[in-house]
């Protein structure tokens, strides 16, 4: 089972360049990137999970409704928010969509403990790893889903074939033919599932220097990511690897 998910989040602009990029522009980038993802998924009849960054929840009600309308799951993404802010965002999404929000994903450096997450009435926590060129420093340690304080913990997935994580950076940088081999090796092995996550901003061209992206992060953005995602979904379909929303697989 492939658990494909997307972080609905704006690109993180360096502090020295923040005055060059308006909040409206960042929201537009996030909206456009997410809309492109939804369109690609719809063409392939695939349903996924979208984790929306806390600060964007109130600013993008139409997008959240569209995600739900298209049959996808909505979760909360904690980049650096307090417990109160997360609870408020969760409530807004639930009232807006009429759907219970089961899952949360958190940036590693600002992660609330499992008992706090459970207190916020989440059912599962989807882990993520730093998405940069230094992930090679991490020792490969395969983990499976487990419970902690009655909260389902879903670890990030790594390929036993390449020792690379299935994160946004790997999908962006690795040639698709090699990525397919990673998937085949994992799925034909003893992996019950693979969690893959990408970012909405990766589906928008961000070549301007004002966004402060390192050169390797500008590679394959925008239309190239759209095409790559479409070809990847076609590969999954032809290989008969199922894709599902996270809440449907674990509950």
Regions found by a protein language model. Give the residues of each.
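Catalytic alpha-helical scaffold of carbohydrate-active enzymes acting on polysaccharides/glycoconjugates
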Residues: 1-155, 161, 179-251
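Active-site capping/gating regions of soluble enzymes
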Residues: 148, 156-158, 166-173
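A mid-sequence, solvent-exposed acidic-amphipathic segment
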Residues: 167-185
């Amino acid at each position: 089972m492939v658990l494909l998910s997307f972080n609905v989040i704006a690109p993180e602009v360096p502090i020295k360049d923040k005055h060059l990029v308006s909040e409206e522009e960042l929201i537009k980038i996030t909206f456009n990137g997410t809309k492109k993802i939804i369109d690609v998924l719809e063409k392939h009849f695939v349903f996924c999970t979208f984790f929306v960054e806390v600060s964007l929840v109130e600013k993008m009600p139409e997008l959240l409704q569209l995600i739900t309308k298209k049959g996808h799951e909505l979760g909360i993404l904690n980049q650096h928010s307090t417990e109160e802010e997360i609870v408020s965002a969760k409530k807004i999404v639930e009232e807006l969509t009429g759907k219970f929000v089961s899952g949360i994903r958190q940036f590693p450096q600002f992660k609330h403990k499992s008992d706090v997450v459970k207190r916020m009435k989440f059912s599962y926590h989807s882990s993520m790893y730093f998405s940069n060129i230094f992930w090679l420093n991490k020792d490969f340690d395969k983990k499976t889903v487990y419970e902690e304080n009655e909260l389902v913990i879903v670890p990030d997935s790594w390929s036993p074939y390449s020792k690379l994580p299935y994160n946004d950076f790997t999908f962006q940088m690795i040639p698709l033919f090699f990525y397919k081999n990673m998937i085949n090796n994992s799925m034909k092995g003893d992996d019950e599932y693979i969690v893959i996550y990408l970012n909405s901003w990766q589906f928008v061209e961000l070549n301007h220097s004002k966004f402060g992206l390192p050169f390797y992060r500008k590679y394959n953005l925008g239309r190239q990511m759209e095409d790559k995602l479409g070809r990847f979904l076609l590969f999954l379909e032809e290989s008969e690897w199922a894709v599902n929303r996270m809440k449907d697989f674990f509950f």
